[in-house]
């Protein structure tokens, strides 16, 4: 019988790990999926700003942290006392890679003595912001199986509207000028250009990130109201590319030369409808003008099958365990 890997997740009480947070994908991975895997023995340490590593010396094989910094990540202790003398590998989940411009990533790597980084982002995107010497693994996760197991049938949903949800840019001139001059990497148009463009169409229904009751674990319930939905991010795919297909939506998916969405395993017109800034209106019109064509349901079902298999949290944990082994 193989010996279980002992993993200690050290964290602070924080909004990001709350059940009430508007994003619960990371919470479900770290607090649920890891716990139910038989190959690891999880130890959860809820701490204050300072944690003494000697308390777990000889009791764990891996230290796991919510992120690589505590500047904006309020789940991470300010100090791991004694970490400089510890031989326990430290693995961290990353946040948004572009946030790395807000702090010294090498300084934080030394502060927490980080050995490995993981996240859902493509490795090439990670290394746009982090040193090539940092060890990183792309690990797909985000779909908590129980939340997507039983979804409303495709034909029972709203068909004549396409759902668009999440952050968008403000198109007013003074907002655009301000964003270009002062927001830099945080300019919404850098991330959500096509998503913003879609809102001008009469058959697109838009909901903001927080402008509805379906936040956190309830997000799939919003998606299940619609037969079709838009997953569009300009520079890098997000978990909407996992969640919308998993919810059974026919997903209009932005796939361009820069956002790495082509690496997610979907096939155009088979498991998703690929769109870009040039063809999105045409693709929408093809759907809206032929709502009852059975091919839309077939594509939605194929997308759901792929998403449930590829992006579920249990598979994510299996990949994470293989990453742990590289440091043992």
Sequence positions of predicted segments:
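Active-site/pore-lining binding-face segments in mid-to-C-terminal subdomains
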Residues: 241, 246-249, 275-276, 296-300
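A charged, aromatic-enriched C-terminal amphipathic alpha-helix characteristic of glycosyltransferases
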Residues: 291-325
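C-terminal "capping" alpha-helix adjacent to the active site of nucleotide-linked donor transferases
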Residues: 276-295
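A short acidic/histidine/glycine-rich donor-binding loop in glycosyltransferase catalytic cores
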Residues: 268-275
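Nucleotide-sugar donor-binding catalytic core of glycosyltransferases
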Residues: 3-60, 65-82, 89-243, 250-264, ...
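Alpha-helical elements of Rossmann-like donor-binding domains used by nucleotide-donor carbohydrate transfer enzymes
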Residues: 29, 78, 193, 282-286, ...
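Short, Lys/Arg-enriched, disordered terminal segments
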Residues: 1-5, 324-328
């Amino acid at each position: 019988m193989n010996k279980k890997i002992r993993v200690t997740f050290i964290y602070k009480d924080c909004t990001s790990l709350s059940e009430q947070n508007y994003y619960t994908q990371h919470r479900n991975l770290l607090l649920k999926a890891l716990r139910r895997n038989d190959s690891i023995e999880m130890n959860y340490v809820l701490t204050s700003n300072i944690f003494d590593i000697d308390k777990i010396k000889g009791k764990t094989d891996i230290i796991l942290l919510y992120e690589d910094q505590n500047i904006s990540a309020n789940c991470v202790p300010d100090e791991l006392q004694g970490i400089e003398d510890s031989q326990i590998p430290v693995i961290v989940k990353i946040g948004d890679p572009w946030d790395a411009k807000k702090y010294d990533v090498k300084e934080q790597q030394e502060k927490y003595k980080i050995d490995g980084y993981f996240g859902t982002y493509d490795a090439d995107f990670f290394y746009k912001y982090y040193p090539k010497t940092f060890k990183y693994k792309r690990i797909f996760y985000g779909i908590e199986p129980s939340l997507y197991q039983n979804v409303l049938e495709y034909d029972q949903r709203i068909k004549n509207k396409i759902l668009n949800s999440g952050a968008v840019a403000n198109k007013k001139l003074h907002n655009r000028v301000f964003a270009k001059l002062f927001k830099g990497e945080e300019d919404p148009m850098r991330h959500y250009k096509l998503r913003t463009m879609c809102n001008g169409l009469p058959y697109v229904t838009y909901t903001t990130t927080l402008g509805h009751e379906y936040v956190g674990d309830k997000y799939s319930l919003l998606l299940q109201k619609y037969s079709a939905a838009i997953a569009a991010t300009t520079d890098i795919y997000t978990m909407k590319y996992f969640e919308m297909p998993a919810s059974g939506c026919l997903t209009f998916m932005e796939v361009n030369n820069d956002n790495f969405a082509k690496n997610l395993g979907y096939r155009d017109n088979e498991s998703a409808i690929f769109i870009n800034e040039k063809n999105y209106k045409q693709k929408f019109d093809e759907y809206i003008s032929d709502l009852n064509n059975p091919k839309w349901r077939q594509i939605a079902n194929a997308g759901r099958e792929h998403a449930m298999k590829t992006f579920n949290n249990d598979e994510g944990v299996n990949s994470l365990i293989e990453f742990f082994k590289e440091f043992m």
